[in-house]
Every structure is written in C-alpha cells, then in structure tokens.
Amino acid sequence: MVVDTDVIVAAMRSPSGASAAILRTARQGRITLLVSVPLAMEYEATCSEAEHQLAAGLTEREVQIFLDAVMAMAEPVKIHFLWRPQLRDPGDEMVLETAVNGRADALVTFNVRDFGTVPARFGIEVMIPREAIGRMRR
C-alpha cells in the first residue's frame, strides 16, 4: 500500500483518525507501506512545515521522530520506471510511480479524483483512509 503525503500529514495531525489507524495497522505488520526516496522526501518537507507542526502540537524533533517511525515500518521502493505524465497534478506522479514500481494493490489519498482511472490500469485501487481501514477490518 502506498499512502499519499496528505494521509501522512493527517495521521500526524490527528492521532485518532483513519489515517493514523493505517499507520498503526502497518506497525502491527498487517499491511506493508511502500515508500520511495522522492515520496519520503515529500513526507519530510510537508510534515516539517510550520503550519502542520503547529496543528499537530509537535516540536521539530517530535516531527522527525514521527517520520523516522513511518520510514522504519515502510518497505523501500526503487523507482525503475517513470510513467510521466499520467496525472493532472504533476505532484502526484511520484505517488503513482511508487505504487507502480512497488506493485502496490492500493493507493490511499484524500485526493482520489486527482488520480482518476490511471492507477486502475496498473491494478491499483485508489481509496480514502476511512475506506482503506474498512477494508482492512473485513
């Protein structure tokens, strides 16, 4: 499973929400999070923004600890193939490329519409965090 940056930020900002539940499920080993270097860098850059730190009530050090924990439970994905351009938002391309190269079966994002039908061509289902948690519970 690949989680978009918006899901990582939501997990950091709201530890009781569906996004954080996805990370807890990964920590329990029930799902595998896939992450590439470009996606990890985006996680770090976005989570480190003052706006998100303040909303989460975390210090810079605590944000780094959170990100280290996410990376520790993720499986690294090497990007062998670039599939650009595929999506409306060029910023989403690295998320799709991580999912395709990592052979993910799911991509979790709050921006489902931005990915359109492209991930389905690669056998990847796109869903919001709440939907992902619902499927994991089945």
Model-derived features: where do they sit?
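Short, well-structured N-terminal submotif of metal-dependent ribonuclease cores
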Residues: 1-35
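Alpha-helix/helix-capping structural signal
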Residues: 6-7, 38, 113, 131
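Short, flexible loop segments at the rims of nucleotide/cofactor-binding pockets, characterized by
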Residues: 10-11, 82-88
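Short, flexible helix/strand-to-coil boundary loops that buttress conserved ligand/catalytic motifs
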Residues: 12-13, 47, 119, 137
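Amphipathic coiled-coil/heptad-repeat helices and related helical stalk/stem segments
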Residues: 18-19, 91-92, 111
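PIN-domain endoribonuclease scaffold, especially VapC-family toxins
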Residues: 25-82
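Acidic, PIN/NYN-like endoribonuclease modules and their adjacent C-terminal/linker elements
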Residues: 86, 93, 100-106, 112-138
